[in-house]
């Protein structure tokens, strides 16, 4: 979701708000596409160059090629790195060395419609399915480190029985998708009726109700050990989200940081070290 207004954004919002009143069905369809279209910057595509020391490969998911990278020996237990909405695999790069040094194989990938992976539209159920496929193809996955929406995907993949991880590190995870959609709607001056229509359309597209995608709803029945790391100064995904997830996940540990925000937390040495120590602990 954008973080600042501009004259062009205001103009777009005015046109969208007007069309929502005159053509609500069209506005709902447009809103659905907007909500399922991640931002894809030039940096995201160029970021693959930061992963040249890894072995690259692709898997096919629903006709789309998903880019993957691997470090470490094939015989070693694996850790999967799952980035969040609008992100890309290279953002998780700082977690690689501590894990490889500890004897793990590390797998990163670009989510559908992100980075150099194919696609234009995607959503949380796709994230969960692709995470499960990546883990299944590589095998021997002991843990996952997931950022933002990637964390919700990890919880959903576990809850659906599509993946099995002994340990999960959730960095800045969301706890309230409906609340996020309401912020999204306010940003684009979207009437609540259109937002509800958008939610219904997305639920129909994926065949699942949104409340069944919420991490606090699925977490109580999960047995994987969890470490939740969240920054108190995160303005995109407030700290209360991570605290809520940790409270609902049985036995979860909560690590709080300060001054890192939503993205710099991924490259902080204290965070990457804590994640590696949690995964390697017996």
Language-model region placement:
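Hydrolase active-site cap/lid region
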Residues: 159-208
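Conserved alpha/beta-hydrolase "acid-adjacent" motif
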Residues: 235-241
């Amino acid at each position: 979701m954008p973080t600042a207004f501009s004259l062009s954004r205001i103009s777009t919002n005015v046109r969208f708000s007007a069309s929502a009143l005159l053509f609500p069905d069209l506005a709902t369809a447009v809103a659905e596409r907007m909500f399922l279209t991640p931002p894809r910057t030039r940096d995201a595509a160029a970021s693959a160059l930061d992963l040249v020391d890894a072995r690259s490969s692709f898997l096919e998911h629903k006709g789309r090629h998903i880019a993957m990278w691997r470090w470490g020996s094939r015989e070693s237990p694996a850790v999967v790195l799952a980035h969040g909405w609008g992100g890309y695999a290279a953002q998780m790069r700082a977690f690689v060395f501590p894990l490889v040094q500890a004897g793990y194989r590390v797998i990163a990938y670009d989510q559908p419609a992100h980075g150099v992976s194919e696609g234009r539209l995607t959503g949380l159920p796709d994230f969960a399915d692709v995470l499960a496929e990546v883990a299944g193809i590589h095998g021997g996955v002991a843990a996952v480190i997931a950022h933002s929406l990637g964390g919700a995907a990890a919880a959903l993949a576990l809850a659906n029985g599509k993946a099995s991880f002994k340990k999960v590190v959730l960095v800045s995870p969301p706890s309230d998708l409906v609340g996020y959609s309401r912020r999204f709607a306010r940003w684009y001056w979207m009437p609540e009726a259109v937002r509800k229509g958008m939610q219904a359309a997305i639920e129909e597209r994926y065949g699942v109700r949104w409340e069944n995608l919420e991490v606090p709803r699925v977490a109580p029945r999960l047995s994987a050990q969890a470490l939740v790391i969240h920054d108190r100064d995160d303005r995109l995904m407030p700290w209360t989200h991570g605290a809520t997830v940790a409270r609902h996940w049985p036995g979860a540990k909560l690590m709080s940081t300060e001054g890192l925000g939503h993205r710099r937390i991924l490259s902080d040495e204290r965070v990457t070290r804590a994640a590696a120590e949690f995964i390697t602990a017996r």
